[in-house]
């Protein structure tokens, strides 16, 4: 999941995977690029912009843009590069594979909203964030509500949370 879900997988042509470290990104890049029949990602171009994963001759942003323009499907691996201050309009999903419940909500939301950039070539009907740590997700949402509300009134918090979830629904898939 979610690549095993045919409906979702059609929307996941260009994705950002937020990794816990450079070594993890390097190892995952190697696994994702194995050209075996068992590898469901063998048709993806993998761009590792974590640490020394990117070539020194091009910027990480240019490397990703070039890969996207030359490939139907890409996976970008990052430990932080390209997660703030830039937009890759073609990204339709972010996979949060790093962080903890202590991950700051500002950094968390800066990263996950990378996939919400407008896209002129193909209008995005949907974009996704996949985070397999419900504690991290719910902690970030709680921090966001607390930081954007001047009161601790329970009803006001519920109203703010309801508004937030209208624009950023949070779902759980059990038994994935």
Predicted regions and their residues:
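Non-catalytic, charged low-complexity extensions flanking SF2 helicase motor domains
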Residues: 148-176
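Intrinsic-disorder/low-complexity, polar/charged segments
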Residues: 21, 104-106, 173-176
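Alpha-helix boundary/capping residues
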Residues: 32-35, 115, 148, 168
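Alpha-helical structural motif
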Residues: 24, 28, 60, 104, ...
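Conserved RecA-like P-loop NTPase helicase motor core
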Residues: 40-41, 45-155
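Conserved helicase/translocase motor-coupling segment
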Residues: 1-51
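Intrinsically disordered, low-complexity regions enriched in small/polar residues
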Residues: 3, 20, 97, 130-134, ...
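Intrinsically disordered or highly flexible coil/loop and linker segments, enriched in small
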Residues: 24, 121, 170-174
């Amino acid at each position: 999941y979610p690549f095993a879900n045919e409906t979702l997988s059609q929307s996941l042509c260009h994705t950002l995977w937020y990794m816990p470290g450079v070594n993890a990104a390097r190892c995952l890049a190697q696994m994702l690029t194995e050209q075996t029949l068992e590898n469901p990602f063998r048709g993806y171009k993998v761009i590792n912009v974590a640490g020394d994963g990117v070539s020194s001759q091009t910027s990480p942003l240019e490397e990703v843009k070039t890969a996207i323009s030359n490939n139907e499907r890409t996976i970008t691996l990052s430990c932080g590069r390209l997660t703030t201050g830039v937009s890759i309009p073609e990204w339709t999903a972010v996979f949060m594979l790093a962080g903890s419940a202590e991950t700051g909500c500002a950094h968390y939301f800066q990263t996950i909203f990378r996939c919400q950039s407008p896209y002129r070539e193909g209008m995005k009907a949907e974009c996704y964030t996949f985070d397999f740590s419900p504690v991290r997700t719910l902690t970030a949402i709680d921090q966001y509500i607390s930081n954007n509300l001047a009161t601790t009134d329970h009803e006001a918090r519920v109203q703010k949370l309801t508004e937030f979830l209208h624009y950023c629904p949070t779902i759980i898939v059990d038994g994935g």
